[in-house]
Amino acid sequence: MSDLDDVVQVVITDQTTAISTASFAIPLILATFTNFSERTRTYLSIIEVGADFSSTSNVYKMAAQAFGQDSVIGAPIPSLVVGRRQVDSVTYTPTVADSTLYSVTLNGIPYTFTSGVGATATTIVTGLKAAIGSPTGITVTGTTTLILTTTVLGTPWSVTASANLVGVNTATETWPNALLAVDAENDIWYELTAETQVVAEQEALSDTIQAMDKIYGLSSADAVAPTTGITDIGYKLNAKNAGRTYGVYSGTAATEFPE
């Protein structure tokens, strides 16, 4: 893959329309979540990120890395953009406990249920379903898990839950489509980072970036990457001369996002 310095040099010499200096210093974090309904939010500090995302989330970890290092112009970043990949369904599995509060905040409205003695996953989910009712645009289902689904795919929405409700997101939007939707709302950013480390998804994002006035930084924990293998993302992008993408190999890339 191309060296980052080479990528910046190419952009400076080949562009017919100059990119603002500010945009070089602003990264985009693209991730799959339901913490807010708009496509993007801009943050000025990791403290602001922490108000929306838990410290264990991928978004927070990536933002902490970004705010903790210099940007491509050699100065601390002034801000970063977090972009949302559309999620159309979230399944919550309760951690069963007696006399415990469970809460779901759906489109800004909190709903709670407190379990009784002899609680089960079914009684907790039943209680939450009763508390939530039938909100507009959302289908509420499930027996031992709470399933929240948008009635129209692609509808913007937000949902978060207490830590004792473990959520799994279901997304059908492709990463390239998510990137284009984010860029249509906010294009001030210059460098993309994304939480996915699936080779096919990284390659698709790289292909999309190649047609944009942006760059893409990725990382991989693929054991093939530092070898002469031909299945890793580095080999694939080198083969197609993906000049707007650079990569980092690390055995802990999936949790530390070194890019």
What are these regions (language model features)?
Residues 45-46, 78-79, 151, 155, ...:
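Subunit-assembly interface segments of extracellular/virion macromolecular structures
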Residues 98, 102-108, 164-176, 246-248, ...:
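Bacterial flagellar/type III secretion structural subunits and associated motility module proteins
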Residues 94, 117-119, 169-179:
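Surface-exposed ligand/attachment interfaces on beta-rich extracellular proteins
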Residues 1-91, 96:
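Extended assembly-interface regions of large multimeric machines
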Residues 82-89, 151-153, 166-171:
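Short domain-boundary/entry signatures in modular proteins, especially
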Residues 77, 130, 183-259:
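A glycine- and small-residue-enriched flexible loop/hinge signal that marks low-structured segments
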Residues 38, 45-53, 94-160:
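Extended, beta-strand-rich, solvent-exposed assembly scaffolds of outer structural proteins
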Residues 18, 34-39, 110-112, 149, ...:
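Short, surface-exposed beta-strand/loop "edge" segments at domain boundaries and coil↔beta transitions
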